[in-house]
Curated annotation (Swiss-Prot):
Short name of one Pfam family: Ribosomal_L31
This protein's UniProt keywords: Metal-binding, Ribonucleoprotein, Ribosomal protein, RNA-binding, rRNA-binding, Zinc
GO biological process, one term: translation
Cofactor(s) required, per the database record: Zn(2+)
Cofactor note: Binds 1 zinc ion per subunit.
Species per Swiss-Prot/TrEMBL record: Rhodococcus jostii (strain RHA1)
GO cellular component terms attached to this protein's record: ribonucleoprotein complex; ribosome
Listed Gene3D superfamilies: Ribosomal protein L31
PANTHER family: 50S RIBOSOMAL PROTEIN L31, CHLOROPLASTIC, LARGE RIBOSOMAL SUBUNIT PROTEIN BL31C
Name of this chain's protein: Large ribosomal subunit protein bL31
Amino acid sequence: MKSGIHPNYVATTVVCGCGNTFETHSTKETGRINVEVCSQCHPFYTGKQKILDTGGRVARFEARYGKRAGKGAAKESAES
């Protein structure tokens, strides 16, 4: 490797908004990285995930055009 072109790779402390800290290595010179969420407080990892069904595009599409598969299946069974 060429000398003088690579950044320094230093031990870095990552500090989460929830108070969790852990050590890693980074090229950031301050030695500290502040983050908003981590694996200890993120809802996906903690299991406290909320599923929000706001009835977006799919619901508007079905309201506008109806469920075509349901109508087609009913016609086929009536013909048989």
